[in-house]
Amino acid sequence: MKRSLLPGLLVAGTLAFGSVGGVAQEVEKLPPSGTTHFTTYFSVHPAHVVEMVEDSSITVAELIGITRNPDGEPYFDSMVVHCLLTIRVVKGEQDLYGACKETDKDGDSTSTTFNSKAHYFIGGTGKYKGITGEAPFTVEILPAPGEGLSAFIIPHEVTWKLE
């Protein structure tokens, strides 16, 4: 007589992962407006550099990192971050501009642009849909993790509104 393995697998799966027909965990909603903090930990890889005359250059860099919310709130926490950045230096004067996509554990994301002072929310998905606001930041430079790489810790103070 053949015995089916399915009942045993279902029991083992239930014990390991919870109820087969269990209640899905509720996704934490973002309040309609607020202020909080998050810190991003970045590794930076300059992709292209063009050196020009008279202390001038342009650099395109890719930033990869994660965020943590030190206030213990569930939003803007454990997000993976992917950014592109341009750094322009003209006769020693530097400015920068970039854009990022931050995605949380639920798959919800924010999109931002940034300059040397703050990130600016241009929208999002899921709990971040309709987000506007800004996140001024400071930069702590870490030792380089390897040749041609940089690393930073960037604390942000974010103020947002859902529209």
Which positions does each model-derived feature cover?
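Bacterial N-terminal signal peptides that target proteins for export
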Residues: 1-9
